[in-house]
Regions:
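Charged, amphipathic alpha-helical regulatory modules used
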Residues: 1-106, 696-701, 706
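Short, conserved micro-motifs enriched in small and acidic residues
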Residues: 13-14, 495-499
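Amphipathic, well-packed alpha-helical segments that form the structural scaffold of globular domains
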Residues: 24, 47, 451, 455, ...
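Solvent-exposed, amphipathic alpha-helical segments
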Residues: 45, 49-52, 426-432, 511
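A structural signal for well-ordered alpha-helices, especially hydrophobic packing surfaces
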Residues: 75, 93, 279, 454, ...
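Conserved catalytic cores of very large enzyme subunits
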Residues: 99-494, 515-517, 521-676, 682, ...
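Contiguous, well-ordered alpha-helical segments that form the cores/surfaces of helical PPI scaffolds
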Residues: 225, 498-511, 529
C-alpha cells in the first residue's frame, strides 16, 4: 500500500478520493463544476502516475505535482486555482500584513483615493479596509503573474480592483421598468406609486438600494419622462380634491397645478438631501447621474425646470446656501427643441442659468456630429452617459452587436459596463524605446493582457446569481432583468460593455517629439486610431462589446507619475509634475481659449466612444451670454460638454465668489470650494480640508484652460 508523507511528517494511506475533494474545492474557487468523466480522468491519471513511481512512500509535494499535471490536461483554470492555493498559509500571512498596514493608515490618517468618500466616517473606514482585502484577494485568485507584474510596474491599471470580483461597473438603470406594476425590494412588495410625492420617495429608495450593489456611476436616464405620469396622477387627484371642497373647475385646476409644482420642487430637494447625506453600504456617496431635457409635455417640462431651479438655488441655511454634488445633472440637447425660438427654449435657458452658477448640468448634444447624435437622429435613441463620462456601444434588439435588418433598433436603457482597464501609454512607449522594440508590438502585448482580463471577467461574473442584485436582475432594472433569484446572470452580460481605457495622451506626444497636444497631437491620434482598430478586431473575434474609454484619472493621475519615475526617471513635460493629463485632454497649463480647446480636443472625440467628456474653464464671472455661446458651439460639434468654474462659498458669512481662497467680506478661510474633479464635481475644500488627493490638488492649482 502506497503512503503519502504529509508536510508535518505524518503518513497516511494514499486515497484517490482525497484528490477528488481537493480538486473540487479548487474548481469551486474557479467557478467550475467538473463532470463525472473529468473526475474519472483525474483519478485514473493520478493513480497511474503514483503507481509508476514504484515507491512505497510519496511526498505531498510530489502528489501536488501529479495532481497539477492532471488538472492542466483537464482545465488549466482549475490548475491555476489549485496551484495558487497550495501555499496559501504563507501567502495569506503576507497578504493580511499588507492589509493591516494599509488599515492603520486608513484608521489614523484617512484615504483620498476617491473624492466621493468621507474617510473620517467610521463606516467609510471599515469599507476602505475591506476594499484593501478585496484587492489582495483579486490579485491572488483572479490575476495571472503577467497581469500582476504589468499592474505593479504601471503599464496597465485595473480600475476598482476592490469591487470587480463581486459586481458590475456603471449602468443606465431602467427605473421606469422597475416601477411599472410594482416590485419587490428587501422582501417587501412596493405598489406602483399613485402620486408624485410617493414616486419621488420610492425612486430615491430604488436608486440608493440598487446603486449600492455596483461600484460605478448609476444613471437614471430621462428622469422627467419617468416622473411625468405620476405628476399627471397627482394633478387629477388634486382637481378632484379641490372640486370636492367646492372650487370651480378652473380654480381647482389652478390650485392642483400649484401643488404639482410644489411636489416637484420638494421631491427634487428631497433627492438632493438623500443622495448627499446617506452613504451607501460601500461607504461612499453613490455616484448618481440624472439626465433630462427632451420631454415636451407640460409636466415633463415642469420636472426639468424644477430640477434645474432646485439645484441653482442650493441647499443649506438661509444666507448660506450652496449647490450639492449629487445627482450629477446632464441636459439632453436637441437643437430642434432647444434652439432659438423652439418649443423648449425656456428649458434651455433654465439650464444655462443653472450651469453658470453651479457648473451643472453638463450638456450632451443629440443633434450635432458623431456617434451619439447619429443614434438619436436615426433611431430616436438617447445614449445618456453612465456616471461621469462612460457611453454604451449599440446593442440591437434582434441582432445583438449588429442590426438584424433595417427595422432593428438599438437598446441603451437597462444596460451596463463590467469594468475598465487602462493603458499607461507613455510608459508603454518608453518601454518600447528602452528595449529597442516596435511601439505597436509592445502596445499589442498590453492590449491582449487587458483583453484576457475582460474575457475572464465576463466568464466569472456570468456565474453570479440574480439574487446578488435583485432590483437589476429580477425586477427589470437591467435589460433581460426578470430572472429568478437562483438564475445565473450570464444571459444579461451579452449586452454589457468592457472598456479599454487610455490616459496621458498629452504626455505620450511629449515623449514622442517634445510637443504637447496643443502644439501637435498627430502621434497621439495615430496611436488612438491603432488602438481602435485592434479593439474592433477583438470585438469580432471574441463576440464581446469592447469600448475605448478616455480615462478620468483621479488618484491615477498621481500614481502613474510615480510609476513612470520609478522605471524611467524624471522627464521634462512627461513626469516632472505631480500629475499626468486625463485621457485626450490638453494639459491644464495650456494658455488657450475655450474655443481653441474645444477644437483641439475635438480631434479625438470619435476615437473614444466608450467614454469621453469635453470641458473648458470659463474665464468669466457668471457671464450668461458667454456660457450660452460656448455651450451652443459645443452642441453643434456633437460634444458632451462641461462648464468649468471654480466655485467658492464662505461658511461663516455666506459670501460666494469665483476663485476665492480668503473671504473678502469677513476674512475667513473657512470655505467650501467646488471644482471639477474629472467628469464630475467634487469638494476641493470643506472646512479647511480637501477630499482630493495631493496630485489632483496640484493639478487644480495649475489650471488655466481645464
Amino acid at each position: 500500500m502506497i503512503k503519502v508523507i504529509k508536510k508535518d511528517g505524518t503518513k497516511e494511506e494514499f486515497n484517490v478520493q482525497k484528490v477528488v475533494v481537493a480538486v473540487n474545492k479548487s474548481a469551486y474557487r474557479a467557478l467550475v463544476t467538473f463532470t463525472e468523466e473529468e473526475l474519472d480522468f483525474i483519478c485514473n491519471f493520478v493513480t497511474e502516475k503514483v503507481e509508476q513511481m514504484r515507491k512505497k512512500e510519496v511526498t505531498i509535494s510530489d502528489m501536488h505535482n501529479v495532481v497539477e499535471g492532471a488538472l492542466e490536461q483537464t482545465n488549466p483554470l482549475v490548475a491555476k486555482s489549485y496551484r495558487d492555493y497550495r501555499n496559501y498559509k504563507q501567502d495569506f500571512v503576507q497578504m493580511l500584513d499588507e492589509v493591516y498596514k494599509k488599515s492603520q493608515s486608513i484608521m489614523y490618517i484617512g484615504d483620498k483615493e476617491n473624492s466621493n468618500t468621507d474617510s473620517a466616517l467610521v463606516s467609510t473606514k471599515r469599507s476602505l479596509i475591506f476594499n484593501e482585502l478585496n484587492k489582495e484577494l483579486y490579485q491572488k485568485f483572479f490575476m495571472t503573474t503577467e497581469e500582476i507584474q504589468a499592474c505593479r510596474d504601471g503599464y496597465i491599471y485595473i480600475h476598482d480592483m476592490s469591487a470587480r470580483r463581486d459586481t458590475i461597473n456603471c449602468c443606465l438603470f431602467n427605473v421606469q421598468e422597475v416601477l411599472k406594476g410594482g416590485f419587490e425590494m428587501g422582501n417587501l412588495w412596493y405598489n406602483e406609486p399613485k402620486t408624485l410625492d410617493v414616486a419621488f420617495d420610492v425612486i430615491g429608495d430604488i436608486v440608493l438600494s440598487a446603486a449600492s450593489q455596483q461600484y460605478g456611476g448609476f444613471t437614471v436616464p430621462n428622469i422627467e419622462l419617468i416622473l411625468e405620469p405620476y405628476a399627471e396622477k397627482s394633478y387629477e387627484a388634486g382637481i378632484e380634491r379641490y372640486e370636492g371642497l367646492g372650487l370651480s373647475r378652473e380654480r381647482a385646476e389652478e390650485e392642483a397645478m400649484k401643488d404639482v409644482k410644489r411636489e416637484f420642487e420638494q421631491g427634487f430637494q428631497g433627492l438632493e438631501y438623500k443622495f448627499n447625506s446617506v452613504s451607501s453600504s460601500r461607504g461612499d456617496y453613490p455616484f448618481i447621474t440624472m439626465t433630462a431635457g427632451t420631454g415636451t409635455g407640460r409636466f415633463a417640462k415642469m420636472a426639468t425646470i424644477s430640477m434645474l431651479d432646485v439645484r441653482r438655488r442650493g441647499q443649506g441655511k438661509e444666507g448660506h446656501k450652496k449647490p450639492v454634488l449629487f445627482p450629477k445633472l446632464v441636459f439632453l440637447y436637441d437643437k430642434n427643441l432647444h434652439g432659438a425660438g423652439c418649443e423648449l427654449e425656456d428649458v434651455f435657458e433654465a439650464g444655462i442659468r443653472c450651469s453658470r452658477q453651479t457648473m451643472y448640468p453638463d450638456w450632451l448634444s443629440l443633434t450635432g456630429e458623431g456617434y451619439i447624435a447619429s443614434m438619436y437622429k436615426k433611431y430616436g435613441k438617447i445614449i445618456s452617459p453612465m456616471g461621469c463620462r462612460a457611453f454604451l456601444s449599440p446593442w440591437y434588439k434582434e441582432g445583438g452587436m449588429k442590426p438584424a435588418d433595417e427595422k432593428d433598433e438599438p437598446i441603451f436603457v437597462g444596460r451596463f459596463n463590467i469594468g475598465a482597464v487602462s493603458l499607461h501609454l507613455p510608459m508603454i512607449y518608453a518601454k518600447s524605446k528602452q528595449e529597442g522594440k516596435d511601439f505597436h508590438e509592445v502596445l499589442d502585448y498590453y492590449l491582449n493582457l487587458i483583453r484576457e482580463l475582460h474575457i475572464r471577467t465576463y466568464e466569472y461574473l456570468g456565474e453570479m446569481k440574480a439574487s446578488t442584485n435583485p432590483l437589476a436582475y429580477c425586477e427589470g432594472g437591467f435589460l433581460g432583468g426578470h430572472l429568478g433569484i437562483h438564475d445565473k446572470i450570464k444571459p444579461i452580460l451579452k449586452s454589457a460593455t468592457a472598456s479599454f481605457g487610455i490616459t496621458a495622451l498629452n504626455e505620450l506626444q511629449q515623449l514622442y517629439n517634445h510637443k504637447s497636444l496643443a502644439e501637435d497631437g498627430e502621434f497621439a491620434l495615430e496611436t488612438l486610431r491603432y488602438i481602435n482598430e485592434q479593439v474592433e478586431e477583438f470585438k469580432k473575434e471574441d463576440g464581446n462589446l469592447y469600448a475605448i474609454y478616455g480615462t478620468p484619472a483621479e488618484n491615477l493621475c498621481g500614481l502613474q507619475v510615480k510609476q513612470f519615475r520609478k522605471k524611467y526617471g524624471v522627464i521634462e513635460n512627461v513626469s516632472d509634475r505631480e500629475y499626468v493629463s486625463n485621457s485626450f485632454h490638453c494639459h491644464v497649463t495650456e494658455d488657450i481659449t475655450p474655443i481653441e480647446k474645444q477644437d483641439l480636443e475635438g480631434r479625438f472625440w470619435e476615437l473614444c466612444n466608450g467614454g469621453k467628456i469635453q470641458y473648458v474653464k470659463y474665464p468669466i464671472n457668471y457671464n450668461k451670454e458667454a456660457v450660452k455661446t460656448l455651450v451652443r458651439r459645443a452642441m453643434d460639434k456633437g460634444f458632451y460638454e462641461g462648464v468649468n468654474l471654480s466655485l467658492a462659498y464662505c461658511d461663516d458669512c455666506g459670501h460666494e465668489e469665483l476663485e476665492m481662497d480668503v473671504c473678502p467680506v469677513c476674512g475667513s478661510k473657512n470655505l467650501t470650494k467646488i471644482d471639477r474633479m474629472n467628469g464630475y464635481l467634487s469638494y476641493s475644500r470643506v472646512k479647511g480640508d480637501t477630499r482630493l488627493n495631493d496630485a489632483k490638488m496640484a493639478e487644480i492649482a495649475e489650471r488655466k484652460s481645464m
